């Protein structure tokens, strides 16, 4: 299964192949990412799920030996064409990485930094944007009295929510999360999962996770990948309760991976 017919598509992947040098890492991937829903990518290490995620904002262009072939349509426009404005694409498609990566600056400036690249706001408007982003990331009440302290002064879970706030401050349309909870404790993980569920009201969210329970709790749709291939893509409840492919069933029941 490669299509999920529910909400309108925000991202459409068509015949996508990806290479690290001569290594064929993604093989003829086809799937639709639903707008304003959460889509999870699961599969064993090395299956290609993070590679696929990073094609959505062309992170691979930082590395000359990596290349993508096929189409990735964002609202109908193929982002893989050379005419695509990378800065504009990454404003539309934000990303949060596995380990919290606050900038070496204040909590306030962590949020304002990206906004300043794309918008010229008055101080009052910037203050409002910072509060809005931190509130969306469920971090405002914990930081409102120390906005000028370093982002490094926050706990790991708070730092990850700061990174999410930073990502949404420029008001993207899509938010990519690459194993955002793998370095966090269970309480922080629970807060991030609640946040992911809330964020889909305003954003299309795509998350890579090793944690199948997390995918089941957070996502509307789940893609199972194995050795660079998309094995199954379905509504999350269906994929975990009545998988269509034996490989999927074997993985979610712990028989391999």
From Swiss-Prot:
ATP binds at residues 43-50. The keyword Cell membrane applies. Keywords: ATP-binding, Cell inner membrane, Cell membrane, Membrane, Nucleotide-binding, Phosphate transport, Translocase, Transport. Gene3D superfamilies: P-loop containing nucleotide triphosphate hydrolases. Belongs to the ABC transporter superfamily. Phosphate importer (TC 3.A.1.7) family. The complex is composed of two ATP-binding proteins (PstB), two transmembrane proteins (PstC and PstA) and a solute-binding protein (PstS). This is Phosphate import ATP-binding protein PstB. It comes from Escherichia coli (strain K12).
């Amino acid at each position: 299964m490669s299509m999920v017919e529910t909400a309108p598509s925000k991202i459409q992947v068509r015949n996508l192949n990806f290479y690290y040098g001569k290594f064929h890492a993604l093989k003829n991937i086809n799937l639709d990412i639903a707008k304003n829903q959460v889509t999870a990518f699961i599969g064993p290490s090395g299956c290609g799920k993070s590679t696929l995620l990073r094609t959505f904002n062309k992170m691979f262009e930082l590395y000359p030996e990596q290349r993508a072939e096929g189409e990735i349509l964002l609202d109908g426009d193929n982002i893989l064409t050379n005419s695509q404005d990378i800065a504009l694409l990454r404003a539309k498609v934000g990303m949060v990485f596995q380990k919290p990566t606050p900038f070496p600056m204040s909590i306030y400036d962590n949020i304002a930094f990206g906004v300043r690249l794309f918008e010229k706001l008055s101080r009052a408007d910037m203050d409002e944007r910072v509060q809005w982003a931190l509130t969306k990331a469920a971090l405002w009440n914990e930081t409102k009295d120390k906005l000028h302290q370093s982002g490094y002064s926050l706990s790991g879970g708070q730092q990850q929510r700061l990174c999410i706030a930073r990502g949404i401050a420029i008001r993207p349309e899509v938010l990519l999360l690459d194993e955002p909870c793998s370095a966090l404790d269970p309480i922080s993980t629970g807060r991030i999962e609640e946040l992911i569920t809330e964020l889909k009201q305003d954003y299309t969210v795509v998350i890579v996770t090793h944690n199948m329970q997390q995918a089941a709790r957070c996502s509307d749709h789940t893609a199972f990948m194995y050795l660079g291939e998309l094995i199954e893509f379905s509504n999350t409840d269906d994929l975990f309760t009545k998988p269509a492919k034996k490989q999927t069933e074997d993985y979610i029941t712990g028989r391999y991976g």
